């Protein structure tokens, strides 16, 4: 038994040139209950590609559409907050300067008296690094400027005043007093 060759359908045969058969999307229809042939699928794909290729706007639409958009902009209500014509200074020269015809009342600030405890104030003055540096310079024999000398004098006067208030004496004991206390000490106390 020999095999018989299947006969081809006429729709399966592709045209030799494009000009021979122009297909439109409507022309390539699916037959009910049957699959599309390769030729019909190719024709449909070509047409869809041609559609996709021309999907965008026409060339030069940017220029031609501007006249239409200009008409639309006139009808729209503009927000007055957008596009202010008031000039904005690039460099701020005066801070809190009142505008013309306005007066800004100064805020009254009450100076709170900072009454520290005399012991704390004395401790702060003794731990003042600037004062200690200036006193070290004086001990080294250097001459201070007028402002530095005034600062040192004021601080030392305040320290003396606070020591009087607290009852602290700055009297240094003489060598004779030290010898007397040394002689009076009983050595047996420390054993």
Swiss-Prot record:
MF terms (GO), sorted A to Z: GTPase activator activity
Chain positions covered by the region annotation Disordered: 1-84
Any one of the GO BP annotations: ribosome biogenesis
Coiled-coil regions listed: none
Any Pfam family the entry gives: YihI
Bias kind Basic and acidic residues: ranges: 9-24, 37-48
Record keywords, A-Z: GTPase activation, Ribosome biogenesis
Subunit structure: Interacts with Der.
Functional note: A GTPase-activating protein (GAP) that modifies Der/EngA GTPase function. May play a role in ribosome biogenesis.
Membership in a protein family: Belongs to the YihI family.
Family annotation (HAMAP family): GAP_YihI (MF_01058)
Protein's recorded name: Der GTPase-activating protein YihI
Organism of this sequence: Actinobacillus succinogenes (strain ATCC 55618 / DSM 22257 / CCUG 43843 / 130Z)
Gene field: yihI
